[in-house]
Amino acid sequence: MADDATRKAVSEIPLLKTNSGPRDKELWVQRLREEYLAPIKYVENNKAADNDWFRLESNKEGTRWFGKCWYIHDLLKYEFDIEFDIPVTYPTTAPEVAIPELDGKTAKMYRGGKICLTDHFKPLWARNVPKFGLAHLMALGLGPWLAVEIPDLISKGLITHREQQGS
């Protein structure tokens, strides 16, 4: 998996029990309850550890998610909009997180700003269906991607901090 801090953070995220996707209307409501509770717990834990880095919300059906994530680099906060849809084959298929404003700036991204998680995250997700949910997607997918890609994009001058854009 990853370093000890990540293992600890992930071990504190509640595992999900309901194996259901959006096509199964009755069980999806139960799964959605679990999906809401796990990120809430993860964000609470992150805040307690002074490591708060994202917010998520969804449409009423829980099939479209959006929010913000941020990354601190050299004491500057870089903030990005994120979005993803729940696949109809969820939870067997992991959602694909998109950061539209970074589209085309890194090779580790697909068209539309979808971040590449195929090599490291998707096999881990597949081994943990249906226990993993959106909080795990953030902790083991988006978080590590940001930690690798954002400093690289900054060093290449492909993204700049908002305060530096005006000068």
UniProtKB/Swiss-Prot annotation:
MF terms (GO), sorted A to Z: UFM1 conjugating enzyme activity
Keyword Nucleus in record: no
GO cellular component: cytoplasm
Any GO BP: protein ufmylation
Keyword Ligase (UniProt): no
Keywords (A to Z) from UniProt: Ubl conjugation pathway
Active site (UniProt): 116 (glycyl thioester intermediate)
Domain of life, source organism: Eukaryota
InterPro entries assigned to the protein according to its UniProt record, in alphabetical order: UBQ-conjugating_enzyme/RWD, Ufc1
Role, per record: E2-like enzyme which specifically catalyzes the second step in ufmylation. Accepts the ubiquitin-like modifier UFM1 from the E1 enzyme UBA5 and forms an intermediate with UFM1 via a thioester linkage. Ufmylation is involved in various processes, such as ribosome recycling, response to DNA damage, interferon response or reticulophagy (also called ER-phagy).
Subunit structure: Interacts with UBA5 (via C-terminus). Interacts with UFL1. Interacts with UFM1.
Family the entry assigns: Belongs to the ubiquitin-conjugating enzyme family. UFC1 subfamily.
This protein's name: Ubiquitin-fold modifier-conjugating enzyme 1
Gene source species: Esox lucius
